[in-house]
Regions:
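Transmembrane alpha-helical insertion/packing segments
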Residues: 3-13, 20, 27, 109-168
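Hydrophobic alpha-helical transmembrane segments
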Residues: 31-47, 156, 224-259
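Functional transmembrane-helix hotspots
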Residues: 199-225
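Hydrophobic, lipid-facing residues on alpha-helical transmembrane segments of integral membrane proteins
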Residues: 56, 133, 137, 141, ...
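Membrane-interfacial hairpin junctions
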Residues: 24-38, 147-149, 183, 191
Length: 280
């Protein structure tokens, strides 16, 4: 299957799944679902998943070249490393001299581990703590601002987490001219940032419970009241984690693709300008 066809098929499958899910989510309330509600859910939440799935399918199929599955795994694991092209070629050449299915799979697993631990993985881990701190501080500030004002809840700003994660992935993908670097950094930023949000939200949920008696995620007052501080904390942890992942999960892929594409376009422009310049 060609990369383009793989992307189209994957996108169609994910879109169909989100169409069904969007209809179910739209009908989760007291009223019957409407086409507009389902379409808005698919467009606002599902469409990023469709595009991200198409990007991943295209890149994986394009990179997966080899005589068997271990060779394709190594090819995918070593793809997208502009500063490690020789390393990837050396690994693929070494695999070609390994006989036996078990030995080839062990080698492929080692290549995957090395690809995840080294290079862009080290950069991503180095930025995890600063990202955690920034998201935690912003969550605390947003919590206190909302508590003193309209009390709409932290869920109102959850899409900002997705955009910030996408921005990190795009910046790293552009700077490193690598989709892989952007993807790894974006995924790490998502994990670290969401951890910062959830950690602070869990603590602040008790403050919202004590001062206003409302849920921190949406500012709603439950009919029977909040049973205990523990219930407020559980709602904050489960709600912010689930909605954070729901909205932000595709954005490391989208940001990395955008950053790498922008870097590639800029490099192509520079090459054309250099080729058109008169030689001294």
């Amino acid at each position: 299957m060609s990369p383009g066809r793989a992307a189209a098929v994957t996108g169609a499958v994910v879109l169909a799944a989100w169409t069904v899910l969007g209809w179910r989510l739209a009908g989760s309330g007291d009223s019957a679902p409407t086409v507009v509600e389902a379409a808005s859910t698919v467009g606002f939440v599902g469409l990023p998943y469709v595009v991200a799935a198409m990007i991943l399918a295209h890149r994986v199929v394009r990179a997966a070249r080899g005589p068997d599955l271990p060779a394709r795994v190594v090819a995918v694991a070593t793809a997208g490393r502009p500063r490690g092209v020789d390393w990837g070629a050396a690994l693929r050449a070494e695999l070609a001299h390994i006989d036996g299915r078990a030995g080839r799979w062990r080698f492929a697993a080692g290549c995957v581990e090395a690809a995840l631990v080294g290079g862009s993985g080290r950069l991503a881990r180095a930025t995890a703590v600063p990202v955690f701190v920034v998201f935690a501080v912003l969550t605390f500030a947003g919590s206190r601002f909302m508590l003193a004002g309209q009390r709409v809840g932290l869920l109102a700003g959850i899409y900002l987490v997705a955009l910030a994660v996408g921005a990190v992935a795009a910046a790293v993908g552009w700077a490193g001219r690598s989709f892989r670097a952007g993807l790894v950094s974006g995924a790490t930023a998502l994990a670290a940032g969401l951890a910062g949000v959830v950690a602070v939200a869990a603590i602040e949920a008790v403050t919202w419970y004590q001062r206003a008696g409302v849920w921190i995620i949406d500012g709603d007052v439950p009919a029977g009241g909040i049973a205990s501080p523990g219930a407020a904390v559980t709602d904050a942890v489960v709600g912010m984690t689930s909605f954070g992942l729901l909205f932000a999960l595709p954005f490391p892929v989208l940001g990395a693709a955008l950053g790498a594409a922008a870097a590639g376009a800029a490099a192509a422009v520079r090459r054309r300008v250099s080729a058109g310049s008169p030689s001294g």
